[in-house]
Amino acid sequence: MLPFVTFYGKNLLELSPEDRSHEGIFLSFQYPVEIPGVSMVNFMRAAVNEQRKYKGLPALTASEFLKLMREKRAVVELDNKLANRSVNEGFSGGEKKRNEIFQMAMLEPRLSILDETDSGLDIDALRIVAIFLKLPKITPSGNPDLGSA
């Protein structure tokens, strides 16, 4: 028998990383990579619209996307200057982690796998991450999932 990992009825081991993302899995890294020349705005718009396309939803217009981005940026208190720069380029460790939490907020995954989320964060960033991770999520059954201790 071949190994399998079932997530919402699908064997994750048979899916590409891209399809795992489409299924709602978010993976953060201990050391997020820099992507020179790719702005956060373009990166996130492509990611969000790919998720929407996979779900059979229309792409967000530029104004809809920018509104969503402003809302999520406010939740994680991401500086507008960071959102307009290349992905993680020249960011401090804490800025990279905050940026990952922003990406997670934008993509609204079903499952987030976080690697040393508190690594390199200052006290303000730790507070934001803690608040964000404690926000109730809604499960497919419609019940709030308050997470575990």
Where are these regions (language model features)?
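Conserved catalytic loops of ABC-family nucleotide-binding domains
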Residues: 108, 128-149
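ABC ATPase NBD Q-loop/coupling interface
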Residues: 4-20, 88
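Walker B catalytic motif
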Residues: 113-117, 124
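Catalytic "switch" loops of ABC-type ATPases
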Residues: 30-35, 148-149
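Extended, folded domain segments that form the structural surfaces/walls around functional sites
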Residues: 1-10, 39, 130
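ABC nucleotide-binding domain signature
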Residues: 21-30, 142-144
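ABC-family P-loop ATPase nucleotide-binding domains
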Residues: 33-111
